[in-house]
């Protein structure tokens, strides 16, 4: 191999610098994590002023596309160029995107600027955990990984009320403007606390790998986003995007095998620890969306509670996850990585098993307790995956392996939304054909016009019928004689459909638990030495004099 660039590291920062740095990391982590939940709260006001209801979801999709794609790229650039320059660049991009979002006067502009925000957010997402991996080893590293995991979970709890307060007290534009002063404070602390790295040797950035990865990942995410919604799964648009994705990813793999400084070294996947941990993280995220997306749907559509009440059911789950993230980061030194992840995945799967018992008479307390079981399992697993990866690879690969865990979890979340949504749509449509269509022939003849319309909807737009469960106004337009027959069938069909979704989630998480059995023993602690098996393309860091 030709001359290879190495990064020089200074001595560990002083306690004062470390305090400034950790404060900056906490501020940056919170305001970046809060952004997603706060923006969701402001969405109705944004649409009310700018219009664009039909493209509203692209405010989330644009951010997701760019942030997910940037995560592995940021991790590698942090290894090549140093943490400080990459992190501060991400902060600046995020702040610029936020200000532009606040100044926008059209929904199209806002979507573009959300994509710019996502680039900054995708750089910031892995950097805090990478820097924690640099600063600490052993139990201290585990403790801080748990703390930052808890902070990320906390953002989902406090985000909606904070967003609502900002929108009510000021206006929706301040949801974005508020990022500027907070971001400046975080940048100052990080700039003061984070030591500069001196790069020796030529910097060889894998531009071909970056390009093919962006094309491959974005095309795949767009196909998953469009499939079954804007376009049919076998439409030329979706098939075309998947074809582009496959070709680009194949090209990416070929490039990564040959380049000196690959964005994601392909031979890492031959490492059992790397593959198993990221596989577990991917499957956990796929299954997780069975709870996050579909339990509120169940409680609103079947049980009949309000959106705010169904949202409140999620809060105890997140609080349980936060608590077990912190406790689990300490327990892992007693239990070991393999045992703790296995126990966490089994607990999470058990929670999904409980969800399959829910019915029309399920109480909020029952649903909340089931969600807390899932949160308990998630908290035991999520921070440990990143910790175990950091403890298993040399420091020069810390950026790559840390960002990989976040990347595969993000991709898993997207797959989860798509797979579980498709399962629900397919099952619910077939159930209406089985249950509702025969019932229509028994309805009074005076309701023939409405009956014919419903029969057509069963074949052309079954989800439109289910949406009536979430709209009392729409249901009131249906004649009472039809409504009394229609509502029980719709609820029964939704219960069966969501039971299938929860069973699929159960199976996916259980596969993740089985995959954990392939994990070798992962020693933890500062005295641990990295084995040759885990060292891939390793070059020792050059210590700055």
Language model segments and positions:
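Helix-loop junctions on the cytosolic side of multi-pass membrane transporters
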Residues: 188-207, 254-263, 360, 426, ...
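Helix-loop-helix hairpins in multi-pass membrane proteins, especially solute transporters
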Residues: 48, 71-209, 213, 226
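A generic transmembrane-helix signature of 12-TM secondary carrier transporters
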Residues: 29, 91, 95-98, 113-114, ...
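Transmembrane core module of solute transporters
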Residues: 18-71, 75, 109, 151, ...
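C-terminal membrane-cytosol helix-exit motif in multi-pass small-molecule transporters
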Residues: 181-198, 214-226, 244-258, 513-520
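Small-residue-rich alpha-helical segments with characteristic i,i+4
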Residues: 158-160, 367-456, 502
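Transmembrane-helix exit segments and adjacent C-terminal regions of multi-pass membrane proteins
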Residues: 2-21, 25, 251, 387, ...
């Amino acid at each position: 191999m030709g001359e290879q660039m190495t990064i020089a590291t200074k001595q560990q920062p002083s306690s004062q610098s470390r305090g400034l740095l950790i404060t900056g990391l906490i501020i940056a982590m919170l305001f970046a994590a809060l952004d997603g939940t706060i923006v969701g709260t402001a969405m109705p006001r944004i649409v009310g002023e700018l219009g664009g209801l039909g493209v509203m979801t692209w405010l989330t999709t644009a951010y997701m596309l760019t942030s997910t794609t940037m995560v592995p790229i940021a991790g590698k650039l942090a290894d090549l160029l140093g943490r400080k320059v990459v992190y501060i660049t991400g902060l600046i991009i995020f702040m610029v995107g936020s200000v532009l979002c606040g100044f926008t006067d059209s929904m199209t502009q806002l979507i573009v600027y959300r994509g710019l925000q996502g680039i900054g957010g995708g750089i910031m997402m892995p950097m805090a955990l990478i820097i924690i991996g640099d600063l600490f080893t052993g139990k201290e590293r585990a403790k801080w990984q748990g703390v930052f995991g808890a902070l990320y979970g906390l953002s989902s709890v406090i985000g909606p009320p904070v967003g609502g307060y900002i929108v009510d007290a000021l206006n929706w534009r301040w949801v974005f403007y508020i990022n500027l002063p907070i971001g400046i404070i975080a940048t100052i602390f990080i700039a003061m606390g984070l030591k500069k790295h001196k790069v020796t040797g030529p910097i060889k950035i894998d531009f071909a790998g970056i390009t093919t990865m962006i094309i491959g990942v974005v095309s795949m995410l767009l196909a998953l986003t469009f499939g079954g919604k804007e376009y049919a799964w076998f439409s030329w648009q979706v098939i075309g995007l998947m074809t582009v994705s496959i070709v680009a990813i194949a090209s990416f793999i070929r490039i990564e095998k040959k380049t000196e400084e690959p964005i994601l070294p392909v031979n890492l996947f031959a490492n059992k620890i790397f593959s198993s941990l990221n596989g577990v993280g991917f499957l956990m995220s796929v299954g997780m969306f069975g709870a996050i997306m579909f339990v509120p749907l169940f409680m609103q559509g079947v049980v009949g509670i309000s959106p705010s009440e169904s949202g409140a059911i999620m809060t105890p789950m997140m609080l349980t996850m936060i608590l077990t993230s912190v406790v689990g980061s300490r327990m892992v030194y007693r239990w070991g990585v393999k045992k703790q992840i296995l126990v966490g995945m089994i607990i999470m799967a058990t929670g999904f098993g409980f969800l399959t018992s829910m019915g029309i008479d399920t109480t909020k307390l029952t649903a909340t307790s089931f969600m807390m079981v899932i949160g308990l399992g998630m908290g035991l697993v999520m921070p440990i995956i990143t910790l175990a990866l950091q403890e298993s690879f040399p420091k020069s690969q810390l950026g790559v392996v840390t960002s990989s865990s976040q990347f595969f979890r993000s991709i898993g979340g997207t797959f989860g939304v798509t797979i579980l949504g498709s399962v629900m749509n397919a099952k619910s449509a077939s159930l209406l054909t089985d249950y509702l269509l025969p019932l229509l022939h028994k309805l009074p003849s005076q309701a023939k016009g409405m009956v014919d319309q419903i029969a057509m909807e069963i074949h052309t737009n079954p989800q439109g019928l289910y949406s009536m469960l979430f709209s009392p106004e729409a249901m009131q337009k249906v004649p009472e004689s039809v409504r009394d027959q229609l509502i029980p069938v719709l609820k029964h069909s939704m219960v069966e459909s969501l039971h299938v979704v929860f069973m699929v989630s159960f199976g996916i998480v259980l596969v993740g638990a089985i995959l954990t059995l392939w994990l070798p023993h992962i020693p933890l602690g500062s005295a641990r030495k990295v084995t040759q098996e885990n060292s891939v393309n390793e070059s020792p860091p050059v210590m700055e004099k």
